[in-house]
Amino acid sequence: MENVIDILGKTINRKLHLAKVSHDYSMVQTFFHQAFGAVELAMAMINDWEKEAVIIDKWEREWEPAFEKIMMEV
């Protein structure tokens, strides 16, 4: 069974893909907020500070900047 971080990564990568192909700023924002909601849900589901730190790090270093880049391009 996959762990929460793997599932979260797949979910956010799917939202990033949809944002890239949408070519619509409001849709990109929608996918960004859905991805952030997934991060919040994942954080609520786990009770492990180390995993939470990994999720926060991935959000701040990978996923959020990727969404910001897409928003700048649209």
Give a label for each model feature:
Residues I5-I7, I12, I46, I55-I56, ...:
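Weak global preference for isoleucine
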Residues T30-A44:
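Alpha-helical oligomerization interfaces
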Residues L18, L41-D48, P65, K69:
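Amphipathic alpha-helical interaction surfaces
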Residues K10, H17, K51, E60-R61:
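Intrinsic disorder/low-complexity segments
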Residues E52-V74:
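Charged low-complexity stretches with an acidic bias
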Residues M1-D24:
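Short terminal alpha-helical segments
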Residues H17-F31, I46-V54:
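Charged, low-complexity interaction regions
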